[in-house]
Amino acid sequence: PTRDQIVAWLRSMVYDPAIVTDELIEQRLATASTPEGREINKRMYSRATMEMITAAMRGPDAVQGFAHLPRIQAPTLLTWGRDDRVNPLDGALLPLRLIPNCELHVFSRCGHWAMIEQKAAFEQVVTGFLLR
């Protein structure tokens, strides 16, 4: 990936573009440029992968995954960034409704990376959930 591609990807993940520092860009670029990083990117973001995901979502078994959510018996915490452009907030509503013992915590002024953008609040919410 190019530096510009990394910057565009990072900015899509966050609410506050100030989080996308030169240091973060260089770190992610270095990681993505390793043989392992290139292989992961290829598996996750290639045209073939996107076509396979799209075909699966349109196929006759597309609903099957969600059909299993009511079987989850463990207490479940969903964390979501209110301003997530990757998986918008309404994407949390179906699992919230289908998982019997599920709760949702929404972080304001937060994109896809709640654990980075709202680190202290995220850790507090998750720790509180795990200690119950």
Which residue ranges define each predicted feature?
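Short beta-strand/loop motif that positions the catalytic acidic residue
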Residues: 72, 78-80
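C-terminal subdomain of alpha/beta-hydrolase-fold enzymes, centered on the catalytic histidine
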Residues: 79, 97, 128
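Acidic catalytic loop of the alpha/beta-hydrolase fold
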Residues: 83-87
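Conserved short C-terminal alpha-helix that flanks the catalytic cleft of nucleotide-sugar-dependent
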Residues: 31-32, 95, 113
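Conserved alpha/beta-hydrolase catalytic His-Asp/Glu region
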Residues: 3-68
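Catalytic active-site module of serine/aspartate enzymes centered on a nucleophile-bearing elbow/loop
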Residues: 100-132
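Short alpha-helix in the alpha/beta-hydrolase fold that links the catalytic acid
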Residues: 24, 65, 74, 88-97
